[in-house]
Amino acid sequence: MASVQKDPILQVETTCGSLLFELQIIWDEVGETETDRDQMLLELERECLEVYRRKVDQANRCRAQLRQAIADAEAQLAAICSAMGERPVHIRQSDQSVGSLKQELGRILPELEEMQKRKVERRNQFIVVMEQIDSITNDIKGQGELVHSEPLIDETNLSMRKLEELHCQLQVLQKEKIDRVETIRKHLCTLYSHCSVLGMDFNEVVGQVNPTLSDPEGPRSLSDHTIEKLGAAVQKLMEVKIQRMQRLQDLATTMLELWNLMDTPIEEQQEYQHITCNIAASEHEITEANSLSEDFIKYVEAEVVRLDEVKASKMKELVLKKRSELEEICRKTHLLPVSDSAIDQTIVAIESGIVDATMVLEHLEQHISKIKEEALSRKEILERVEKWLSACDEESWLEEYNRDDNRYNAGRGAHLTLKRAEKARNLVTKLPGMVEALASKTIVWEQENGIEFLYDGIRLLSMLEEYNILRQEREEEHRRQRDQKKLQGQLIAEQEALYGSKPSPSKPLGGKKAPRMSTGGASNRRLSLGAAMHQTPKPNKKADHRHNDGALSNGRRGLDIAGLPSRKQSMNPSEMLQSPLVRKPFSPISTTVVASKANIATTTTQQLPKNNAVNEISSFATPIKNNNILRNLEEEKMMTMMMQTPKNVAAMIPIPSTPATVSVPMHTAPTPFTNNARLMSEKPEVVEYSFEERRLAFMLQSECRLV
């Protein structure tokens, strides 16, 4: 009974039977039909089959998984053994009793774990060796620590044979690294020696080759490029050392020669004994620090330069003395001396040793003797030239003297000036003959010597020819001025014949002479055109203000600058209406009167004295009959001009004639008070001109002066 209870299948069957019996009882009570009962029983059987089928499938899958795990473990174990180059440790025997799948898997897994541990250890050995190989390779290639990636390992080949090959490769690289380190060390030692002798900074030189070499504790580049640059730096410093050694030996040789030449004392030579002792030394024998540095060579060069200066100082003094002698001779004979730049270049060449000073001195002696011979042949002509130049100076002084209007004024030393002027006139009369004689002498000299006679670098004949041309031009100018004065005299005579002679200026109306304002003779001469001035009454403040405003107008200022007369405004407006001769703008004007008036104005302006500060106020009258005749002539002339072509009209436009009495703007002084009736009787009649007419008159008047 106990065995039955222990059997689970029997227990299940018993349980199922009891449950089925209990189900029958329930169906009986319910009253289920047999068909329904059979159908329900079929469903129960079907459900039981499904449960069994699921359980069977699950068991099959578990068996397949165990078999796959065993196969995978065996494959991994075989791959590891193959990669490590060892014989597989798990080989299934066909005659061997096979246990369950779980037992077989349990036997394989420990072996697999053991082989995996061995593979990891072998792989780590490969990594260590390959990292060392990569490090040395990077040092040789000059990459240093730039590459930090893990080395690539072939997982399929981790055999001991491969590991031994890597160890051999590592040993070869280590040996090459040692050789490169030794080569770099030798180069660095050589560089240090050269830098010490040449006075250079070792770290700076090495840093230019490769910055890693200047750090003694850090890693250094062992690449071929670094070694090549080190070798090039060593070679370059060797060449610099040889060049400086040759320079120093040349300086020492020159120093010995200068010492022997100038008998330098032994005490002074002892200071540079360590330099002269290496005069025949080779490159390897010079090892003293800074013995070939730039500062030391400059120090020796400075001493050699000082000795050269001492040597050349006396030669320079001789050359300068000869040059001064040559310049003095050339100055006295009016010859062009040797240029200072050429002498300076010669002195520099002597100081540098390019030219022998003895040869230069001989050349200067020959040149001085040649200049002296030429000076003897030029002596007579030079004396005549000095006389001619002195006469030219007197001629210039005489011209200035003749242009002085005050030359005849009595004063201190006037009689001496007159005597000098008389002597100058006598000397000027001899100038043409003097120039002709000098030119003939010069031509003869040039024919005899075959060269041009130069006076301070200019040919003397050219100077004489230029002087003759200038003299002729001055004579023509004087002749033209005399003709112009003669013509002006004729015009004045015609004016006097037409208008009569100019009356003397009227005296001031008052008993007291009016004070004159000093405004400058040049301004008054410009404003005065030969017409008489009228006296103005003393204005009040209000009228004076109006007068000043009118004087500042643009039209009046333009006429004042042009030198033409402007209309004087009256103080009383009624006086303007009483003037019967006020002319409308652009009315006909007489050409003959205009020309005569312009000539009179020019002559009067030229004859005014320089010391006259203000023109006196005066007036003169012209008969009215003459004005009527002039008006008729002007109308006829204007009709003739209108018949001409436009091209000829501009040439025939007459200058506006100046009326008989014209008021010219000028600075006037106040006069004593007079009554208005007297002023009305004495006030001149004014003819009004437009601005265009006055400007045209000024232009034509300027053309007449030029002619």
Curated annotation (Swiss-Prot):
Mind telling me which Gene3D superfamilies this protein's record contains? 1.20.58.1520
Q: Where is the signal peptide?
A: none
Q: Which residues carry this modification: Phosphoserine?
A: S504, S528
Biased amino acid composition, Low complexity:
500-512
**Source organism, top-level taxon:** Eukaryota
Q: Where is this region: Disordered?
A: 495-574
Q: Which GO molecular function entries does the Swiss-Prot or TrEMBL record give? A: microtubule binding
Instruction: List localization entries.
Output: Nucleus; Cytoplasm; Cytoplasm, Cytoskeleton, Phragmoplast
Q: Give start-end ranges for the coiled-coil region(s).
A: 49-84, 157-179, 269-289, 354-374, 464-486
Task: List the Pfam families hit by this protein, alphabetically.
Answer: MAP65_ASE1
Residue numbers for the site described as Microtubule binding? A410, A421
The entry's protein name is 65-kDa microtubule-associated protein 3
Q: Organism source for this protein?
A: Arabidopsis thaliana
